[in-house]
Amino acid sequence: MFNGIIYKKGIVTNIKKLKSSIYLTVQSKMKLSNKDIGSSICCNGACLTLVKVKKNFLDFFISHETIKKTNFKIIKNNDSINLEESIKFGSKISGHYVQGHVDLCSKVKKITQIGKSWVLKISIPLKFRKYIIEKGSVTINGVSLTISKVNKLDFDITIIPHTLN
């Protein structure tokens, strides 16, 4: 379980496409060691199991199901990804509870700048609409965000400069 607050990023350094899966290597400044192998790491919103650690390089195996439902289907070398370690007992919860079980990829339909903030209009298939409520939470690429407006086939989120950084 995670909370959707991103303190670390990683850079994709190797993508090994297998028959129906991906073996992914990410360079990161996360302080992990061999004792952390098997731990859950939130990578762009998806809960992935850490399978290898070597210095600042983290390896993950991505299943076919995860590829289908996430942006890992279009990931490239040198892409930046959001990383978050799982919540530890007693740690601060700043976002919302994030399981890392991704339902779908959506498209950004429109971006509007309002002052120093950005409003993103994001499409949502009708069958998922019932889960999207105004002032509710949504996780996008691992980031906990508040839904500011809901329409029939899309919803809005507002991103402040701190979140964008």
Give the residues covered by each predicted segment.
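Conserved loop->alpha-helix
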Residues: 1-165
